[in-house]
Regions:
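Active-site neighborhood of phospho(di)ester-bond hydrolases with catalytic His/Asp-centered motifs
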Residues: 5-7, 28-34, 51-56, 79-82, ...
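Active-site environment of divalent metal-dependent phosphoester hydrolases
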Residues: 10-14, 36-40, 57-62, 86-91, ...
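Helix-adjacent hinge/juxtasegments
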Residues: 47-87
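Zn-dependent metallo-beta-lactamase
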Residues: 38-58, 123, 131-133, 146-147
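Short secondary-structure boundary/capping segments
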Residues: 42, 68-70, 99, 115-117
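Binuclear metal-dependent phosphoesterase catalytic core
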Residues: 2-3, 17, 72-74, 97-103, ...
Length: 151
């Protein structure tokens, strides 16, 4: 199972398109906010499941949607958020604490524009800013294999 994780595309549709073209096929795409409508302009594999949460810029532009959610993918529980509502810009403790409280295996978040791949419990994964060509891939087989990438 392959999960593509992006965040903070901020209207840079070309970079987002490059990321999707580079990875070609994936089972899920998670957008952790701030540019979720950018996905509308990009061809996504037909069978891919799209999961999005609204970031602070999305909300400022009047886009309605959840700011965090919990999803189970291949038996792993994902806490997905932009992170601003949990204070991620200054400290990731709020994101970590909420993911832990909810019993999640991994927290996927954005907002900081800084990539993070920390094997804590729960796992903390921030793909960085897609507007700069940064993204992440999570491969799930017997365990989580998280990788940060750049186009």
């Amino acid at each position: 199972m392959k999960v593509l994780v992006v965040s903070d595309s901020h209207g840079n549709i070309q970079k987002l398109k490059n990321i999707i073209e580079t990875e070609k096929s994936f089972d899920y795409i998670i957008h952790c906010g701030d540019g979720i409508n950018d996905l509308i302009h990009i061809p996504i594999p037909r069978d891919a499941i799209v999961i999005t949460v609204c970031g602070n810029i999305d909300r400022a532009r009047g886009i309605a949607g959840k700011t965090w959610l919990v999803e189970t993918i291949c038996g792993y529980t994902f806490f997905i958020t932009h992170g601003d509502e949990f204070g991620a810009h200054h400290d990731i403790t709020g994101v970590w604490s909420e993911a832990k409280r909810l019993g999640c295996d991994i927290a996927c978040f954005g907002h900081t524009h800084r990539a993070m791949n920390e094997k804590t419990s729960p796992y903390m994964f921030n793909p960085g800013a897609a507007q700069s060509g940064m993204y992440g891939v999570i491969n799930i087989s017997n365990n989580l294999m998280c990788e940060l990438k750049r186009v």
